[in-house]
């Protein structure tokens, strides 16, 4: 691939961050498989401060479709159990006195379809964000061209580079979506 312009590199960097955000959000989507990423947004009351669970405990994937949460301070067992049970994820946490265990039930076919629909919406939002980056960066190129800093041909070349980067990132977003869709439907 030919060396990219600074305009294209800037667009590429912003689009890369958008894709990373999309992947991070998909990690939080509940499939039937146990994952610790789902618990990143659940906060527990830690001495009066809402604190993410992963900052007060060790999370690990256990056997039999469970996540095991081992708090560093045993006093946190009950608040962790309470935070998980009151979350909107539909999990049931069990405190055995040493650790909190969270079972991941198999989602029904209907739940799986709803999850796929939700991640499809996330994909579309990601594509819109990518296109907005393209629009903003092409607008910058046109402004610079109008100032006379670059020629018409250079501006056209930069716009084509930015469009190519958009296509690459939209294709990558589709691949990420398809992997997650497959994971949901097969779990």
Curated annotation (Swiss-Prot):
Record bears the keyword Protein biosynthesis: yes
Keywords assigned: Cytoplasm, Protein biosynthesis
Gene Ontology annotations for the cellular component aspect, listed alphabetically: cytoplasm
Gene Ontology MF: a single term: ribosomal large subunit binding
CDD domains named in the record: RRF
Matches recorded under Gene3D superfamilies: 3.30.1360.40, Ribosome-recycling factor (1.10.132.20)
A GO biological process held by the record: translational termination
Disulfide cysteine pairs (residue numbers): none
Entry coiled-coil feature ranges: none
Subcellular location: Cytoplasm
Pfam families noted in UniProt: RRF
Family membership: Belongs to the RRF family.
Job description of the protein: Responsible for the release of ribosomes from messenger RNA at the termination of protein biosynthesis. May increase the efficiency of translation by recycling ribosomes from one round of translation to another.
Entries under NCBIfam families matching the protein: frr
The protein's name: Ribosome-recycling factor
Organism: Petrotoga mobilis (strain DSM 10674 / SJ95)
């Amino acid at each position: 691939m030919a060396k990219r312009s600074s305009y294209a590199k800037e667009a590429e960097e912003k689009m890369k961050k958008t894709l990373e955000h999309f992947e991070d959000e998909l990690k939080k989507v509940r499939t039937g498989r146990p994952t610790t990423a789902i618990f990143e947004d659940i906060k527990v009351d830690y001495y009066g401060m809402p604190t993410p669970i992963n900052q007060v405990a060790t999370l690990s994937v256990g056997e039999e479709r469970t996540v095991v949460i081992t708090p560093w301070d045993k006093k946190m067992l009950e608040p962790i159990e309470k935070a998980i049970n009151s979350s909107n994820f539909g999990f049931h946490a069990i405190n055995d006195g040493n650790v909190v265990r969270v079972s991941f039930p198999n989602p029904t076919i209907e739940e799986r379809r709803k999850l796929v629909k939700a991640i499809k919406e996330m994909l579309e939002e990601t594509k819109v964000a990518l296109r907005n980056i393209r629009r903003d960066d092409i607008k910058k190129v046109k402004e610079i061209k109008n100032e006379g800093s670059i020629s018409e041909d250079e501006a056209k070349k930069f716009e084509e580079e930015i469009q190519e980067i958009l296509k690459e990132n939209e294709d990558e977003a589709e691949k990420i979506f398809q992997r997650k869709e497959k994971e949901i439907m097969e779990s």
